[in-house]
UniProtKB/Swiss-Prot annotation:
Pfam families: Nramp. One of its GO terms (cellular component) is plasma membrane. H(+)-stimulated, divalent metal cation uptake system. Its main location: membrane. The lineage of its organism: Bacteria, Pseudomonadati, Pseudomonadota, Alphaproteobacteria, Acetobacterales. Keywords: Cell inner membrane, Cell membrane, Ion transport, Membrane, Symport, Transmembrane, Transmembrane helix, Transport. Signal peptide: none annotated. One of its GO terms (molecular function) is symporter activity. This is Divalent metal cation transporter MntH. It is a multi-pass membrane protein. The chain crosses the membrane at residues 32-52, 62-82, 101-121, 131-151, 168-188, 209-229, 256-276, 296-316, 345-365, 366-386, 401-421. The gene is mntH. NCBIfam families: nramp (TIGR01197), Nramp_1 (NF037982), PRK00701.1 (NF001923). It comes from Acidiphilium cryptum (strain JF-5).
Amino acid sequence: MSDLVSRPGLSERTARAVADRLAGRAGWRNPLIFAGPAVVASIAYMDPGNFATNIQAGARYGYDLLWVVLLASLIAMLFQGLSARLGIVTGRNLAELCRDTLPPALTIPMWIISEIAAMATDLAEFLGGAIGIALLAHLPLMAGMAITGIVTYGILLLDRRGFRPMELVIGALVGVIALCYLAELLIVPVHWRQAALHTVLPSLPDAEALTIAVGIVGATVMPHALFLHSGLSGARVAPQDAAQRRRLVRYSNIEVLAALGVAGMVNMAMVAMAAGAFHPAHQGIAEIGEAYRTLSPLLGAGAAVIFLISLLASGVSSSVVGTLAGQMVMQGFVGFSIPIWLRRALTMIPGFVVIGLGVNPTRALVLSQVVLSLALPVPMLALLWFSTRRALMGALAVRGITAIAAIGGAIVILGLNVILLLQIFGVNVPLPG
């Protein structure tokens, strides 16, 4: 292992396997050791916010907006790949690079905005898990929130044993979500030909479809996922030369394609399930609880329970990931962090306040997405700037077609976020043409 420096969290066995792979001594198991960061980050694309948006899209417009999910998934792959590359090449996360490179007049506001975004993210994910538990166990929502908090804290304690146990648990929950939606597709009558057609044929039936499309794409690249992915990728190993860095980036790109590909297919399955189950007879469904209560009489209790299990796995796993991202944001921007139990407790408070005040959980989810839309330019533009700097990234600086695609993706995401905010505040945005 002399040709590679391992970072805390790698077991001796894993570190040896990493060294063998980077030295070109391949084994059948070795590629699996690089899996983890993208799997964890992919949870951001299967969180309860995605559930609500995709259910609304499928219920109201059938398969018409599947192409939007495909576009969103491709953009997500690009930016998560850039985030992982940044961590591998520099050994630092995005927040640390901002602190070390930019003046305090910029980094302090960036930190505050990013912390608010992390709390807004955790609010949505925490509420999603709580809704799943409450509906599944027939408990009050407050009780569901308390159980969600305890479960997520228990998973977070695994971090004391290194990042691998945590990644395995998150990966297992990703598998649960994927299997649940595979089962749903076997139960729900899906028109596969229409689904395939609308995946590649863009269409916007009316102005309201634009609103939902913006909601799907505009919330795709999550601020906390960009911070977290760079940190997890940089925390693995310290490559000793350019060849090792290139290999790590290549393996990372493969993992991003696989993990985000699964996330994209899960999102497409959500839309297809909602289209097959609810469209056109139940077009007005827009809330998670309403979808659950409608599924049971339509397709049986089994379909409804599977839906809740997937929601629970999504809420718990994404809440864990959101807490980890919040820790990384604080550590990166200001150089210190608070105990994980304290952050978990603090991020639970807004959820209890929201529900205690009688705010509709779905409304709270929507408001959290507004906050994320406002915060998104901070990590996205910083990531683009760092990724294209040859002085920082060397030969792995993003350029050419990749740079053009990244800039184009940023313009699409930021433009759609502006449209989303305009629509939320009552400004009517007409369809093009």
